[in-house]
Amino acid sequence: MKRIKFLSLVFVMLVTAMNLNAQNKNVDEVLGQNLDYNVISTAVPFMMIAPDARSSAMGDVGVSTSPDVYSMHWNPAKYAFIEDDFSVGLAYSPWLRSLVNDMNIAYLALSKRVSPKSTVAASLRYFSLGDITYTGENNTNLGTYSPNEWAIDVTYSRKLGNYISGAVAGRFIYSDLTQGVLDYSKPAVSVAADIAVYYTRNVYWFNNLDAVFSWGVSISNIGSKMNYNEASTKKDFIPTNLRLGPTLKLDIDDYNSLAFSVDFNKLLVPTPPIYQTNEDGAIVYENGEPVVVSGKNNDVGPIQGMIQSFFDAPGYYDPQLGRYTGKFKEEMKEFTLGIGAEYWYNKTFNVRTGFFHEAKEKGNRRYLTFGAGLKYNVFGLDVSYLVPVNNTATSGTNPLENTLRFSLTVNIDKWGNNTRLEKVN
């Protein structure tokens, strides 16, 4: 399959994501974002893809939903409250099949309770870009290769009180996009960490209804920048992300329960600024540095970038005022919103739905999600389906359409001699 156009788009997006001229006129072929605006691009965007069918069926929410084996991606602090002693989960998604037919993402997760208050967990995420045919000058065939990226995570989660828990996680990320075909390219690596908090307790807000209120906060992928080019010192940010939100679960009766969740997300990565250009459209440099007209220089370290990301949006040029305005408005548009609902019958069958919204200027992803699942004995099987409500690609279709995800879980209530979760009403 000839996919040279695809390769160039992916390579340019990932390898030069933080290029000075960040106003790309294309579609992000990993996340499906519209890049025609001032979108924040990072290396390894596959780290932001929801891996499991449960949360992806609920509008990509998960920071405060009830704990499961896939909590590593959403909020590792939830593991401290997981009820099962040992869990294994395997998730798979054929990714962006409207663009290519062999891109996919797989996810393996394990969790083990080590005490009534503590749980350890690990996960492996693997993203394959499929088979890509590389060509050189005069369309010389350089061979077919399979670029891939992967990450491995470990976490320790502990209850800090009757209703609250915390977690820290470590992560190693590896990205090999060119398989050594290009002389100046190399695989990129990063080491990152997560910190997270989770709170959950029974509440008595409704007559004759048992309810559980939860909230969570997680900052993920706090780590080193990545470099794909041996001939350059330019490095790209990884997708450091802030996720927070609440969940309310209602036990309607002994057989029926309903939960509602909301997630807010913000990339803690600098927004590309607006640079001064000359009459030819080239960026103007002063003392070796590009001249920033609005916003802030995004060539900074990871920690400074996290702090700066809350107040560095360049805004929009107002020709009547002759200056850039709306900086706070643009900053608020960098938050995405996920809303989800989950219904369970007899703790055996479930249906889920949700909605995800991203501002037009920041990627323009908007979609409905649906899903269902079954739980029998120690086994669980879930599936989700994504329906875009807008078209972002120039072809008039959305690269995310018809996205399916599948998850299989095995939950063992008792494994070894460890005691069960310490429960408090």
Map each language-model feature to its residues.
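Subset of outer-membrane beta-barrel
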Residues: Q23-N425
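Bacterial Sec-dependent N-terminal signal peptides
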Residues: M1-K25
